């Protein structure tokens, strides 16, 4: 099953995205979500199918959410996922002996 999807980015949270079916637009997005998300900014349109790979989302879950609730919300990554941790020896370099 292929779906044409519009993807919107949040002006409030970096790396937060809202996926909706292009034909529906934002009609099925709950009103309570928009104050949290902010005014959606259209990023791009995409054809989704079960074979397609997404960088940070499970395509099966995205397609299920689009069918069942009319949208999919992609949350920003957790801090641990994008912060590079320094080796212990570098962290202690300036410690007093």
From Swiss-Prot:
Q: Which PROSITE patterns match?
A: YCGL
Report the superkingdom from the record: Bacteria
- YcgL domain location is 3-87
User: Which Pfam families does the entry link to?
Assistant: YcgL
Q: Which SUPFAM superfamilies match?
A: YcgL-like
- InterPro entries assigned: YcgL-like_sf, YcgL_dom
- Name of the protein this chain belongs to: YcgL domain-containing protein Pput_1298
Species per Swiss-Prot/TrEMBL record: Pseudomonas putida (strain ATCC 700007 / DSM 6899 / JCM 31910 / BCRC 17059 / LMG 24140 / F1)
């Amino acid at each position: 099953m292929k779906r044409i999807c519009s993807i919107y980015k949040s002006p409030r949270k970096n790396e937060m995205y809202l996926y909706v079916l292009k034909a529906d637009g934002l009609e099925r997005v709950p009103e309570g979500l928009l104050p949290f998300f902010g005014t959606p900014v259209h990023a791009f349109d995409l054809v989704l199918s079960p074979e397609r790979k997404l960088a940070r989302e499970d395509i099966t879950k995205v397609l299920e959410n689009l069918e069942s609730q009319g949208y999919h919300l992609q949350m920003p990554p957790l801090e641990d996922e994008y912060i590079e941790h320094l080796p212990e020896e570098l962290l202690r370099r300036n410690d007093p002996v």
